[in-house]
A protein has these predicted regions:
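Glycine-biased, low-complexity coil/linker segments
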Residues: 385-386
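Amphipathic alpha-helical scaffolding segments comprising HEAT/armadillo-like alpha-solenoid repeats
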Residues: 285-289, 316-328, 346-359
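Auxiliary alpha/beta "docking" domains used to position bulky ligands
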Residues: 1-189, 237, 353, 359-365
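C-terminal amphipathic alpha-helical segment
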Residues: 232-264, 277, 281, 285-309
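Short inter-helical turns and helix N-cap capping residues of alpha-solenoid HEAT/ARM repeat scaffolds
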Residues: 300, 330-332, 360-366
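Structural detector for internal amphipathic alpha-helices that build alpha-solenoid repeat scaffolds
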Residues: 304-314, 335-347, 368-376
Length: 387
């Protein structure tokens, strides 16, 4: 009875602090081995791309007790960031910069971590326990834990799906020395549905529940540091930071609710951003504009790279003066995508004229390949692992 009362008190406190979902999971077993094996397979197939850090401390990722042997229970918290409107509508406006819903407001790490620390202080005071808090910053696999804690299940798109809140949940975890009875694990409710798989514009899903990050727009626009493979650029459309397609089409979103968290509210300087405005940012303007935003993690050069791909896909030749000004950028990834965007917007003769007198001054193989001065093999494919 005391344990049940403890769980009820913890749940009530977490909701009071602003969390939208609370569950309790064991720290050993309950899918840990399976999650670890799936991660190893993902890594062995090279599907992680540039994310070499995923291969470090795999045993700790797979089992919370390997990360912290004293842990007896995991309290898994969900923070709803559901959008108030259709996140896919912006894709029909090719001149605008499409940013993933999770980055429309303040950086969620700051919001969730502050609440986790508040919950942790209360737990330590009221229950005399030890604990550690995590929000996407340690080798801990939050989604399998969230499924074990009955917050939802990992859908065919590999993200968590909640019966009550759909696909829009940020996750945080408290590992504690408290012995708390686990909640009953949520079962998979995807059935025969494959909407998330079929909508992917770059074919990133190898199979249901299996993602090749090297083809995923979220990975390419946020994590990938090099040149984006040419065959994947058209599918990016105007997406410059992340992609919500597979999340947004999930039928379980009919139960989703718009977030009540003010910090996640859409900021006009992010949601009303044009591709030309984004591509024109210098480093100082980038840092000022995105100071408290997740967009800051890409750095200015990669975000401009993404915007140039969007401009090439948009087909609006009025962007050419801006694109031409970026042909002499210090960053090779910016120069290369400026060349690619120009090729999309100009006829052959105009493109050739633009490249006159530039060959001698360009040494980067990938940029030269975009001009057509080097073999196309210099532009990496998603399977090559280069770039």
């Amino acid at each position: 009875m005391a344990e049940k009362n403890a769980k009820a008190s913890i749940r009530a406190k977490a909701l009071e602090l602003g969390f939208d979902a609370v569950g309790f999971a064991p720290t050993a077993g309950s899918g840990s081995a399976q999650a670890g094996n799936e991660l190893r397979q993902f890594l062995e197939q090279g599907c992680h791309g540039d994310m070499a850090w995923l291969g470090r401390r795999i045993d700790q990722r797979a089992a919370p007790t390997a990360l912290w042997p004293a842990a007896r229970s995991a309290i898994v918290l969900g923070s709803n960031y559901g959008p108030g409107d259709d996140p896919l509508a912006i894709l029909a406006q090719p001149g605008r910069a499409a940013v993933s819903v999770y980055a429309h407001g303040r950086d969620y790490h700051d919001v969730v971590k502050k609440r986790l620390k508040s919950l942790g202080r209360w737990l330590a005071s009221d229950f005399d326990c030890q604990l550690k808090v995590f929000v996407d910053t340690a080798p801990l696999m939050e989604k399998p834990l969230a499924q074990s804690a009955a917050l939802g299940w990992q859908g065919k798109h590999t993200n968590l799906v909640s019966r009550r809140l759909g696909s829009w949940l940020f996750l945080g975890v408290v590992l504690t020395t408290l012995e708390l009875e686990p909640d009953q694990q949520e079962s998979d409710r995807c059935g025969s549905c494959r909407r998330c798989l079929d909508i992917c514009p770059t074919g990133a899903f190898i199979a249901p529940y299996r993602l090749d990050a090297r083809r995923c727009i979220s990975y390419l626009t946020i994590e990938h540091q090099g040149h984006i493979p040419a065959e994947l650029r058209p599918g990016m459309g105007n997406r410059v930071f992340g992609c919500d397609d597979c999340l947004a089409v999930c039928p379980w979103n009919k139960f989703a609710q718009a977030s009540r968290e003010a910090a996640y509210s859409a900021r006009p300087e992010i949601t009303d951003l044009s591709l030309t405005e984004l591509a024109a940012l210098d480093d100082d303007a980038f840092r000022t504009r995105f100071r408290q935003s997740p967009l800051k993690r890409t750095g200015r050069d990669r975000l401009v790279r993404n915007a140039l791909i969007g401009l090439g896909n948009a087909g609006d030749a009025s962007a050419m003066p801006l694109i031409e000004s970026l042909l002499d950028e210090p960053s090779p990834v910016v120069r290369a995508m400026a060349v690619w965007a120009a090729r999309q917007l100009l006829d052959g003769a105009a493109f050739a004229s633009l490249g006159e007198n530039r060959s001698a001054g360009e040494s980067d193989p990938a940029v030269r390949a975009e001009w057509g001065w080097e073999p196309d093999s210099n532009v990496p494919s998603p399977e090559s692992g280069e770039g």
